[in-house]
Regions:
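Gly-Asp-aromatic-enriched flexible segments
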Residues: 1-176
Length: 176
């Protein structure tokens, strides 16, 4: 993953929610949209090491798909397994899965430079909104993607992502 132009990241577009007595933001938010058909979605949001963030991911229920098969928002889980014939196809693709130990279509956040830190978000089977708290251990741009198969051949890296449909909106709240 390549970082977005650094000049765009110098001042993320945080919207102030409240200020302390010195006029410093206490809570600020930033948003970004993402598509699950992209190998990686840069957000242009720069995270700071050690700062606490709360994030929410919203996507319309039943809006994600993989080659025509419906996928739960946030990926499959033991509570929401794929239908049996889709499970067979996904089983054949496990050796190509981007993150072998994570479920298919699990949302992954990556920050830092190339090969940075990753956080995997667990879906809520009752709600299409996913929430989590993070505290990065390094500075860097926030990227978001889903866990699907990849091919290590130039031009084909995103082959299995191309048939995915849907996306969502990430809202990140910075807490001072």
């Amino acid at each position: 993953m390549e970082s977005t132009d650094a000049k765009k990241l110098e001042k993320p577009e945080w919207s102030d929610k409240a200020k302390d007595k010195d006029g410093q933001p206490i809570i600020a938010t930033a948003t970004a949209s993402f598509e699950i058909s992209k190998l990686c979605n840069p957000t242009k949001i720069l995270l700071e090491k050690g700062v606490r963030y709360h994030l929410e991911i919203d996507a319309p229920p039943n809006s994600w798909s993989d080659g025509g098969f419906q996928v739960p928002v946030g990926g499959f889980s033991a509570n929401q397994p794929p239908i049996w014939y889709h499970r067979i196809l996904l089983g054949l693709g496990v050796p190509l899965r981007r993150e072998l130990t994570q479920d298919w279509f699990r949302i992954v956040l990556r920050y830092g430079r190339v090969g940075g830190e990753e956080v995997f978000l667990d879906p809520d089977p009752e709600d299409s909104k996913i929430e989590a708290n993070i505290r990065p251990t390094r500075d860097g741009e926030l990227f978001i993607f889903v866990n699907d198969a990849v091919i290590g051949v130039p031009g084909l890296y995103d082959f299995f992502y191309r048939n995915n449909g849907g996306g969502g909106k990430l809202t990140l709240t910075r807490k001072y």
